[in-house]
Amino acid sequence: MKRLLSRLGKWEYKWLCLLVVVVLALHFAIIKIPDKPVFDEMHYITDARVIISGQETERGEHPSLGKLFIVAGDYIFNGFKTPEVYTGATTGEFLGSNSDGNMMLTVSDASLLNTGQTIIIDKELMEITATDNGLNQITVKRGLGGTAVAYHEPPESIYVFKDDALSWRFFSVILSAISIILFYLICRNLSMSRRASLLATFLLSFENFTFLYSGMAMLDVSSLTFTLAAFWLYLRGNYPASGIMVALSALAKLNGALAIIAILLHWLIVRRDRIWKFVGLIVFAPVFFVLLMPLTDYYPFHGWVNPLERIMTMLKGSASLTFANVSGTYPQKPIEWIFRWDLTPYYFHPNYLAVVSYTVEFLIVPVLIYLLIRALGLDTKFWLSIIRLPNKIWLFVIKLPGRIRLIRAKPLEGLELSQTQEEAPELSQIYTVKLETSRAHNDAGIFALCWFTATYLFWIPAVWITDRVTYPYYIYPTIGAICIGLGMGFEQLVRLFEVRKSGKLKWSAISIVVIFLLAHLAFFVLMSPLTYYWGGPIFRGLQS
């Protein structure tokens, strides 16, 4: 037993496993809250119901793999049977194709139906908003989830869906747990220390927007999991397999194709190895995207579909969504994703507040600067900073690695002030301070910047050129790159605490880390849907 405990204590992944278990427990604690679709879940859950009922998908603008995870959850949690059940009721009047919104509908027996149920009549989904058993009437919201408002001649059978939130969201929660594991493995394959990797993974796991989105029945969740799998396989050197994962990411949601940009940039900057295997990655991604598309489309379309025609349909549908023709408060240009800090409510009570944790969002720009500094150490003598200062210089950074040099314009050069707290010489000129280091380039810094470029910076010229509408939740796959930078930075502060014997700098470093982590958890507690579940009236009031 002692030997087992000793091995467990030395096992690298014990804290990662604990983190995954905690996150899964929190997700499953609220997976059924609310028991109705939240935000864009409505589109994908409705489409899953359409597919299950034997009809062709209504959301042809998206690839099908992400939808199949929702469909699979419905089947598994309904005993591998369709959750669509005949109610015993039929329609008692004509329904016109021009009558949308809420309307009264006479049925054969209203007592068989309940308020809040989703029903399907032919191919049209409706939500029951009220019932009147005495008059055998129900009030329905027509065209639910974008299904076509159609003409219905009585009597038509009314079916109700018996699926629930657990079946819709189950695979999103499982895939999000897999994403946490993959993210940690990515950090380790970037030569980050165990501590830095765990810090980054902790920050990502309890980042509000990531947690919120990871528990929703959305296509982006499965797409991100395959993206992270592609990154991990690439960093391990499994190039062809990485290309297949990129294809699967794009088959879940087209945005997943951006993963190949991050991989290509990193390979060109850092690796440039095994060129033919890397060419295999670049070739496998589009080839498997096309080859696997008919398989993923077969059930949603209930037949074989030409993948090239599907691709053209998706691209045309995407191109038609521009800022010029899409209204509402949700569309935002990419620059607003990181500089607009307002909350976007998806649902109230429990509150689904779509906002990147401020502990992360406020530091996006500083973290990018830090990552750039770490990434640019491409040679053994990298000039970390060049700052022009007045003639008096106080060397308050004496413990930084490297040497501090005070260099004057020619002919005087190389006046060295290394490792001293003395005031700089009284000279009348302006000097240049340089910190000379011996670090090589930092692979994690470079990869995080490539990741950020592919999933965020790409959208800036794309929107400028095409006017393609974008939404703030498009930042979801980018957050991991920022957490890598935060993990690296905080690990350096912890190391500074360890190497310093005493002094204010020692305790300041560890205080920054502790305060930040507590603030990060506090924001998560106050903003996540979990607050409503465990927090009582105080936290509910704070969120209202």
Residue ranges and their predicted role:
Residues 38-39, 209-220:
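Short acidic/glycine- and proline-prone juxtamembrane loop motifs at membrane-interface regions
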Residues 222-241, 245, 481-485:
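Specific aromatic-rich, kink-prone transmembrane helix
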Residues 82-153:
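Autoprocessing Asn-cyclization modules and mimics
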Residues 281, 321, 389, 393, ...:
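Transmembrane helical bundles and short interhelical boundary loops of multi-pass, membrane-embedded
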Residues 21, 166-191, 198, 229, ...:
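Transmembrane-helix motifs of polytopic, lipid-linked glycan transferases
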Residues 1-5, 235-236, 241-242, 246, ...:
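Perimembrane helix-loop-helix junctions
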Residues 267-368, 373, 377-381, 415-418, ...:
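Transmembrane-lumen/periplasm boundary regions of multi-pass, lipid-linked membrane glycan transferases
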Residues 20-23, 200-205, 232, 246, ...:
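Short helix- or helix-capping micro-motifs
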